[in-house]
Curated annotation (Swiss-Prot):
EC number: 4.3.1.18
Protein known as: D-serine dehydratase
Organism of provenance: Citrobacter koseri (strain ATCC BAA-895 / CDC 4225-83 / SGSC4696)
InterPro entries: D_Ser_am_lyase, Ser/Thr_Dehydratase, Ser/Thr_deHydtase_PyrdxlP-BS, TrpB-like_PALP, TrpB-like_PALP_sf
GO biological process, one term: isoleucine biosynthetic process
Family according to the record: Belongs to the serine/threonine dehydratase family. DsdA subfamily.
UniProt xrefs under Pfam families: PALP
Subunit structure, as described in the record: Monomer.
Molecular functions (GO terms): D-serine ammonia-lyase activity; hydro-lyase activity; pyridoxal phosphate binding
């Protein structure tokens, strides 16, 4: 971006200066609206999410047999909630900031099949595509027991089709493993920052991995191009996919049920704050949408990004969305949080969710590593760096009187709050890789 343009951008949007300087930055969104007002801009409805629920229920018998680790939950891919009081105390001690209310961790990091939040959206979109093909071919009705899809006839049928996706790692892992299981030929286009073990795991499932020296945007573009030349190839578009988004959105109702089981109340007097790591935006966007449908105006969602990859904060804050990249403001998009190393946000997600987000913030890789170490020490829970992005959120909210006044929160409401940090990945990180992560924390 030329100097004059940059000067005028900073004059209009002063926080851009902090993003350029790679400072840890918090932006509380002055443009939030009620769910009723913001919902029409999403372009998807509660019925769409209900349909996704129903589809996953139809596939449950298939998943229970195809992936024995899901048998205990009857083929439903869901993660547990952990209350983390020792981590809450450690954060208060390290940062000198009391966290009012209770701190919880949503362990999507330990979801079955692929060990990340992407087991929600990625697997859902592959299943939705398989169902569509099988229904159109007359091989299946929605009344059938979907475990018939494990038969050789079905695998033979699916083998004439292929799937392509561009990914920094976890989405590729979910889509690759699921597609290979169904019988699709699958190619994952991986960006330079993808971890070697994720590529190796995919190849062990018979997935074709194409590696690029460039970043995420290039991998997605190449994947899209390759798929265009083959009518039997379906490209899963992480930047624009409504189907992926709905796969994530199912998490809202599921969390509501988990809270009900625990007797945990969410209402005006007991607000829920949720902190979601954000890369291109599909995962956190879909989950936040589902949470809003489940809890309405009593849930407050925040996206968390690395200081080196603040694409969604930049896009939503300036209103430029996918018309601007972090590279254009001189930020390098190089971060240890490989799942969040995205330079240009999804325009679909930014525009859909900009009224329903309470804020976005950035944190340094160093901060992620520190918190990774503390969580392992205090709670015995091991995550990958990007999964800690949400852990910095509760202090930012509890520290900001401006934000509390903006939403007229009383001290009593905050004392009754639930702070939920969404842990997005790390359950399948190899031991030696995890040891390197732990060595970097203080």
């Amino acid at each position: 971006m030329e100097n004059a343009k940059m000067t005028s951008l900073i004059a209009q949007y002063p926080l851009v200066e902090d993003l350029i300087a790679l400072k840890e930055t918090t932006w509380f969104n002055p443009g939030t609206t009620s769910l009723a007002e913001g919902l029409p801009y999403v372009g998807l409805t509660a019925q769409d999410v209900q349909d996704a629920h129903a589809r996953l229920a139809r596939f449950a018998p298939y998943l229970a047999k195809a992936f024995p680790e899901t048998a205990a939950t009857g083929g439903i891919i869901e993660s547990e909630l952990a209350i983390i009081p020792a981590m809450q105390q450690r954060l208060e001690k390290e940062y000198g900031q009391k966290i009012s209310g209770e701190l919880l961790l949503k362990k999507d990091s330990h979801l079955p099949i692929s060990g990340s939040i992407k087991a929600r959206g990625g697997i859902y979109e592959v299943l939705a595509h398989a169902e569509k093909l099988a229904l159109e071919a007359g091989l299946l009705t929605t009344e059938d027991d979907y475990s018939v899809m494990l038969s050789p006839e079905f695998r033979q049928f699916f083998s004439q089709y292929s799937i392509a996706v561009g990914s920094t790692g976890n989405l590729g892992l979910s889509i690759g493993i699921m597609s290979a299981c169904i019988g699709f030929k699958v190619t994952v286009h991986m960006s330079a920052d993808a971890r070697a073990w994720k590529k190796a795991k995919l190849r062990s499932h018979g997935v074709t991995v194409v590696e690029y020296e460039e970043d995420y945007g290039v991998a997605v573009e190449q994947g899209r191009k390759a798929a265009q030349s083959d009518p039997n190839c379906f490209f899963i578009d992480d930047e624009n996919s409504r189907t992926l988004f709905l796969g994530y959105a199912v998490a809202g109702q599921r969390l509501k049920a988990q809270f009900a089981q625990q007797g945990r109340v969410v209402d005006a007097d007991h607000p829920l704050f949720v902190y979601l790591p954000c890369g291109v935006g599909g995962g956190p966007g879909g989950v936040a949408f589902g949470l809003k449908l489940a809890f309405g105006d009593n849930v407050h969602c925040f996206f968390a990004e690395p200081t080196h990859s603040p694409c969604m904060l930049l896009g939503v804050y300036t209103g430029l969305h996918d018309a601007i990249s972090v590279q254009e403001i001189g930020v390098d998009n190089l971060t240890a949080a490989d799942g969040l190393a995205v330079g240009r946000a999804s325009g679909f997600v930014g525009r859909a969710m900009e009224r329903l987000l309470d804020g976005l913030y950035t944190l340094d890789d160093r901060t992620m590593y520190d918190m990774l170490g503390w969580l392992a020490q205090e709670e015995g829970i091991r995550l990958e760096p990007s999964a800690l992005a949400g852990m910095a959120g509760p202090q930012r909210v509890c520290r900001s009187t401006d934000y509390q006044q903006m939403h007229a929160f009383s001290a009593e409401q905050l004392n009754h709050a639930t702070h939920l940090v969404w842990a997005t990945g790390g359950g399948m990180v190899p031991e030696e890789e995890m040891a390197q992560y732990l060595a970097k924390g203080r």
